[in-house]
Structures are given as structure tokens and as C-alpha cells.
Amino acid sequence: MSKLIIAEKPSVAKSIASALGASSRADGFYEGSGLLVSWCVGHLVSPMDAGGYDERFKKWRYDDLPILPESFRYVLAPGKEDAFENLRALMDRPDVDTIVNACDAGREGELIFRLVYEMTGCRKPVLRLWISSMEDSAIREGFSDLRPGADYEALYQSALCRQKADWLVGINATRLFSVLYHRTLNVGRVQTPTLAMLAERDAKITLFHKEKYHLLRLTLNGAEAVSEKFTDPAEAEQAAAMCKGVTVTCTSVTKEQKKEQPPKLYDLTTLQREANRLFGYTAKQTLDYAQSLYEKKLLTYPRTDSRYLTSDMAETASCVIHLAAKLPPFDGCSNFFPLVETMISDKDVSDHHAIIPTMEIEKADLKLLPVGERNLLLLVCCKLLCASAELYVYEAVTATFDCGGYSFTAKGKRILSEGWREIDRIFRAFLKEKPADGDGGTLPDFTEGQIFDSAEIAVTEHFTQPPKTYTEDTLLSAMENAGKDDIPDEAERKGLGTPATRAAIIEKLVTAGFVERKGKSLIPTKAGINLVTVLPEPLTSPMLTAEWEQKLTEIAKGGADPDTFMDGIRTMVQELVSTYSCISEDGKKLFAPEKEVIGTCPRCGQPVYEGKKNFACSDRSCGFVLWKNDRFWTSRKKELTKKMATDLLKKGRTNVKGMWSEKKQATYDAAVILNDTGGKYINFKLEFPKRKAGGNGR
């Protein structure tokens, strides 16, 4: 008898087949050593659209809301029928007695497999392959320790709840507000609160009022000491005058030894954030690069929320550290003795450990990797080396001075042991980036009571700064920490979305036209700000959505009831529809398309705008309208264009070529003259070009 192993992607199936000896390639699967290895192509099965439940749901109407299926139905994803039928046929083979779920080891991977398994009607026993690396040794080790599929039932229920909640909120809220505002407004359970955070930051920036302030700066033996802020420029100038030419006294010198622990390893979110800071990569780009490196066996599983390793990985981690230390530019680090134990914490690892390189980096030619993947792999290597390096130790020095009765402060530091920061500095130099720690250089050896005959004094002007726009780095951090203060400390999941879904959420907002990228910044568009303005708090509250995400995590751990969660979602949707049945006229204007002024009304002097079917005066009581398909134009097989209308308003005439004469069955050119008599309809006259005088001289 044979086991059928189902992976999430063809590339993963190929690696599994190679590692387990299924070397014979057939149509849609590998075979060998008593195994069949096949694959999904992402999600093969998807929730049915609302129109599939009832014909009337194919049209968007308020009266049909809310749409709350008693039981959810599923359909094959378009274009993936062949992949599904291949898996169904393999599951039905009489020599297959066991199915192995080898889809990605996480919530979505579990859902992808289970929906296929359920739709085929297969009832053969299921085992689960759960691995964090695509190395051959990791695959073989995982296959020798397969777990019963039933052990992951709670994870599957969590995935189902997430999918159903997204469907219920997305379908109902999107239809509700699209119908009310006569424009497609995509509303999502997670993406809308994310948009709300962007809009809130944009409002703070818009409303920010900058304030001027001044500082006095003393230059002493090459070091700079700074005063407190002066809000009154006259007071700052007066203080500077009092300090000129007078002695300066060092009133205190404090020295404190400080230590900085090595940074933690990367989880997906911190990797995406740093890749955005250093390389400008979007969250999606980083995830794509990391996934590709994982499938090439160079990186461990990327969709993780842990920043530690388990104790059974200590030996492997030590080997990988020494391999990474041989790679340029890290081979220039001095006296590197890794401390693996600082990265180990079994209690802080749930499904997957932190992201680290694999042993395969020893054999890989990194120069052959695409530049994005190479940068990311070196970034992960750098973090692994930093995390296992020694403490960064320095002496923080603060010196205070008195000059003319005013106090000044100078700060600096003296490095005692560079530790992990040496690796970070070398890597940043390799990238031609500034060191991460640029705070304070070395101060001269000041002593308390030291007197300086005089010092250079300068007044500098400054302004308070508004909040910074979100970048993908800072937005990912905000998403991760949303609702953190309102969820118990012991809660495992906090924030909007998961490490695996946040990149897609940002991309959806950009694609929908609610957010735009300007350099590294993410800026909400006018449509995005208006959407947040009109939506109720249950849809825009990051805290509420973070609580939902927390509940999904509890369901995955078996600590919460899926039915109770879904009842809460259904109740929220029902209340949403019953509360929002109509909107004000001002509300409707929020999403009205912006009209372009094309000229001035010849009757009343008000602006004339282009509409869908006409060019009309903005003052409705005036009544001046130029219809695009006026009979004057259609009888001549023409349509009034924006340029023609602009000419008529500006010059009272427009030249038109190729007008049709029904009588002569031919085209002709003429000038069309605006002949407005003040009636309901506008009249036009034709003026033909004068023919050139001809003749033979008789």
C-alpha cells in the first residue's frame, strides 16, 4: 500500500519527493518508495460567491442584506479544475491507504488541504507533516514523526472561522456601503482598520501646527553643549549676548556603564520591517523573497511569529552560525565566539521557530541568487550572527556647563566592547548605510569645576516636527501592536492580521485605490479617507479587530468555541445593516466624481462642468446645457467632445471636420456657431468656409 503526500506547491512537492526517494515522475505526481507525492496550486477550493446561494444576490441591493448563509458552500477556484481532479484521482486509488497533509505548516496551509480533502469526499486517514525547513534532513526527520491529522482540528476550525468572518464582513459591508454611496467601496475585516490607522495619522499631520524654537550652542574643545529650548527668539538672543566673552564652568560630569543585549532573531514582521528600512522592499516583496529562499532550502519557514529557537536546535544553529561567519562581509569580524544559548527559548516558540539560514548556504553560490533574495539572505545571516554575539558595552558620558547663568549639556559615549554592533556596523558599511547608532561621539575628558575662559556661542532655529507618515516598516509595527494595551499580557496573538497576511492587506489597500505609495511612505487617498469617515467604529476599530484575531488564536489552541465566535460576527453584521439604511445628501457627495471645469456659462457666468452625458452650468436654475448627443450632432454622425464644447464656450464657435450630410450622402467641414436664444435647448448655426476664387483669367 502507498501513502499519498499532498504539498501546497509543485516546487515543494519536488523537494519532498527527492528527499524521500519518490524519484519517478508521472503526470501530476511523483512516485517511489511506497509513496505518491502530488500538490495543490495554492487554494484549489474557495467559498462560493453570494450569487451562488440565490439568483437575486447577483445584483447588489440593500433589501437583500444581510446575506447570512446557514452553511457555507464551496466551489473550485477558476482554472484549477485539472489540479483538483488529479488529486481526487490519486486519493481514490485503491493502493492509497493514507493521506499525508504536507501543505505549509500553518493556518492557511491547513485550510488549503482540508477544503480539498472535504470536497473530494475522501475518508482515508490523514497524517500531518509539520516542518520548518525544506532541507532533505528536515523533511526526512519530519516524515519519521508524522502526527495524526485530528491533532490539527482546532487549527482548521480557526482557519474556517477566519475565512467565514472575512466573507460575512466583506460581502455585507462592501455591498451595504457601495449601494448607499453609489460607488464600489471595498470593506474588509482587517484592511479597513488598517486604513483607519493611516487616515488618523494623515489627519494628525494635516492638523499639526509647527512651532518655532531656538537653542544656544556652546563649542568647547571641539565638543558641543546645548541649552534648553527658547520659545521666544528675543530671549534666546539676549541669553546669547550674556554668554559671549564670559567664562564657562563645567558643573558636573557623570559616567555610566551601559550594556545593550544582542537583538533577537527575525520573525516575519521584523524581517519585513528591516528590509523596508534598509532596502525599501514592500512587505509583499520581502515575503516573496523569503518564500523563494525557503523553497530553495536556504532559509527556514518564513511565516513565523517567533523570534527564538528551540533547545533541540542548538547544535544545528551553532553550525549555521559558523557557516554564516565565513560569508562576505562577515568574514571580516574579529574574535567572534557565538553564544547560542541566548537565542534558545522553548516557551517562546509555538508553531515555528525564528527565521534563520540553513546549512545549505555552505554549498550555495549566493552570486547566482536574484539581488532581492541575496540581500534578504545576507540580512538574515547578519541577524543570526548579531543575535549570538556578545553584549555591546559602552560608557555614557554627560557633562553640564554653566555660562552666564544658563545651563548647557553635552553627551557622548566611549565604546568599551563593540560586541554584536561590530557585525551590524560591518554589514551596514557593506550596504553603504550609516551605522544604526549615531547618537553621540566621544567627548573630551571634561572634569567637574573645569573653567573655560570663553566659548563660541551660536543661536540655532528649529521647528517642532509633525508625526511622520507611515512606511511599511512603521505600519507593520502598528498593525502588530494594535489593541495591545487592551488584551491580557498572556495573550499570544496581538494586532491586526497575522505575519502571513499583513503584506496582502497592504497590497489590497493600494490596489483598491485607498492608499498610494510615495517613496517609502504610505499615504491614504481622498477616497480612503472618505471611506474611513463614513464607516462605523466596528469596521474601523483596530482594537476590536485585534480582539477577533486573539479569539482566532484561542480557537486554534482549543481554548475558544468557533460557533460562539461566528455568532458574534453574524450579530455585528445584522446590526450594521439595520443601523445604516440611508445616508445624507452631504454623505453622497463624498464619493461623487470630481468634475472638471471646462469653461464659463455664457448666460450667468458660473463654471460649466463636464458630466456623463452633457456639459452643464453649475447653477441648476440657469438651465444652460450642451448635450453630447444632441440631435444636431447625431444627425451629422458626431458627438460633442470636450474640446468642441470648450471652444464653443470660449469663442462661440468650433471647427468640425467630417460631418455627415444625409441629403448629399457625403461628409463636409464647417464651423459650428453657438446660437443661444435662452430657451431650454441650445441652437447652433453652420458657417461654411469660403471657397477660394478660381478662374482662367477671362
Where do the PLM segments sit?
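Basic, low-complexity terminal or inter-domain segments flanking catalytic cores
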Residues: S2-L4, K80, M91, T174, ...
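C-terminal or mid-to-C-terminal helical accessory/interaction module adjacent to the motor/catalytic core
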Residues: A138-L218, K255-E256
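Conserved short loop/turn motifs at secondary-structure junctions
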Residues: M1-S2, A102-A105, H182-T184, K255-K264, ...
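Intrinsically disordered, low-complexity regulatory segments
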Residues: M1-Q163, W167, P338, P466
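Metal- or metallocofactor-binding catalytic centers and their adjacent structured scaffolds
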Residues: A150, P233-Y266, Q272
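Amphipathic alpha-helical transducer elements in NTP-driven molecular machines
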Residues: P10-A17, G34-V37, V41, A77-R88, ...
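Flexible glycine-/small-residue-rich
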Residues: A7-E8, W39-V41, C103, V169, ...
